[in-house]
Swiss-Prot record:
Organism name: Cebus albifrons (White-fronted capuchin)
Molecular function terms from GO: metal ion binding; ubiquinol-cytochrome-c reductase activity
Lineage per the UniProt record: Eukaryota, Metazoa, Chordata, Craniata, Vertebrata
Places the protein is found: Mitochondrion inner membrane
GO process annotations (BP): mitochondrial electron transport, ubiquinol to cytochrome c
Name under which the protein is recorded: Cytochrome b
InterPro entries per the UniProt record, alphabetical: Cyt_b/b6_C, Cyt_b/b6_C_sf, Cyt_b/b6_N, Cytb/b6-like_sf, Cytochrome_b, Cytochrome_b_C_euk/bac, Cytochrome_b_N_euk/bac, Di-haem_cyt_TM
Gene: MT-CYB
Binding site for a ubiquinone: 201
UniProt keyword Heme, yes or no: yes
Alphabetical list of CDD domains matching this protein: cytochrome_b_C, Cytochrome_b_N
Cofactor requirements of the protein: heme b
Keywords assigned: Electron transport, Heme, Iron, Membrane, Metal-binding, Mitochondrion, Mitochondrion inner membrane, Respiratory chain, Transmembrane, Transmembrane helix, Transport, Ubiquinone
GO cellular component: mitochondrial inner membrane; respiratory chain complex III
Complexes and interactors: The cytochrome bc1 complex contains 11 subunits: 3 respiratory subunits (MT-CYB, CYC1 and UQCRFS1), 2 core proteins (UQCRC1 and UQCRC2) and 6 low-molecular weight proteins (UQCRH/QCR6, UQCRB/QCR7, UQCRQ/QCR8, UQCR10/QCR9, UQCR11/QCR10 and a cleavage product of UQCRFS1). This cytochrome bc1 complex then forms a dimer.
Amino acid sequence: MTSPRKTHPLMKIINSSFIDLPTPSNISSWWNFGSLLGACLMIQITTGLFLAMHYTPDTSTAFSSVAHITRDINYGWMIRLLHANGASMFFVCLFLHTGRGLYYGSFLFLNTWNIGTILLLMTMATAFMGYVLPWGQMSFWGATVITNLLSAIPYTGHNLVQWIWGGFSVDKPTLTRFFTFHFILPFIITALATIHLLFLHETGSNNPSGMASSPDKIMFHPYYTTKDIFGLTLLLLLLTSLTLFTPDLLTDPDNYTLANPLNTPPHIKPEWYFLFAYTILRSIPNKLGGVLALLLSIMILTIIPATHLSKQQSMMFRPITQILFWTLAADLLTLTWIGGQPVEYPFEAIGQTASIAYFLIITLIPLSALTENKLLKW
């Protein structure tokens, strides 16, 4: 008799996606980050739901409601810190997952890659709106500065900013709508992640060599479920250690001060995972130019497949491109560091150099591919 796992309409979908799924036998730990992102999303939705039960999206009570969660709710402090640090873990996994896709040429699966880019943008939007909700100093001023960038759009910019604010400044209507979107977007992200998986299973997973893996595939369960559980254990260990030992390591002290529109913090900056883009934004003296560079720093991912000129899919056997890739990784770390520094010498000059290097390296990668093709006489 055939197992219900293979015949039941619902079980059949789960079976073909997570149990009997044919998977390349040589995929490394870099392929673990997909499942870790799923786990991060579940952690964020679960902790977020419990926080939403006690949070009030009103400028007069938002800050005190977060203090109430931390002090008076059973394990409220832990739920809040898991949610805040869980976002950091989410972005660590996101950046590593995207980096793996770039290194091993997974961007050639166009549908999967494009949905992934949309997922990255939506996650960034969700995190930004979540950062505004505690209504601390950095929440208020971060929201004011970032939303005000839209005023750089010709003709409609000023009206667009006021439409987003719901008035003439960041106030109660802004907070209410940010809470609404912050609540609904994770569920849209979950739906998009399902589509992302659907497209991935249409083509099958890539592998480190970049070669066809059809002749050598194994079942996903038990081999890769065990591997994923091990990865998840390490992630949870890191998240709980961060939450319980150094909970404020990645947060801004200014956010423990109630939002005050009359007092500007000495240095307005977003959360650490946006700092690379923030550095690129402020490296350009022109407002519109900075906004365009900021957008391009993320949207450049969509044109990466069109610039792939190598005869090999993966970078595994391409030493020149490998040097460029790891230089790009170091450049992104430099941009992140500079974003947390004040706009003064030497940080300003380093930021401008690193911003130019970011776009230059991405431009040089297709040229290095052509050079490697010539060296290999392809």
